[in-house]
Amino acid sequence: MGLRLSEEKTKIVHIDEGFDFLGMHIQRHKKLGADRRFVYTYPSRAALAAVKAKVRTACRGTTNQSLSDLLKRLNPILRGWTNYHRHGAASKTFSYLTAFTWRRVWIWLRGKHPKATVKELRRRYLPGWHPQQDEVRMFYPDTVAIVRYRYRGAAIASPWATKDTAA
């Protein structure tokens, strides 16, 4: 039982070129305003394309249902994807996904009520330009906080440390 690497599945690249792994694109960049280079993890383009396809399919051909049913289908998709990708440099991607989803919901509303004016749609479904109905509100991915883990050094903090022993 030995380890064999498949040449079709294995790829060796330089970190400056970047690579995709588990839905993230990992690449080293020069930080703006600094001379040092840092490794960043972004959501990969394939992962973004996949979630956009899920949003499109959720909005396609369902105008016979209510807006709250659409939002109940969309919100778990968006929450799950953003919670998975919130540990990388994803704030611009989250803003883009928010705009994309809002646009798809707007197109869905225009298809559901083709003769309604923008003012009527806004009054009925978009209070403050936030899609909602029956206490169900659209989830905005750009409101998710980006959480990164800090390097703590070689010493791991003891969970049993008291104020006296921590010093």
Task: Please tell me what each predicted stretch does.
Residues 1-167:
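Non-catalytic terminal/accessory segments
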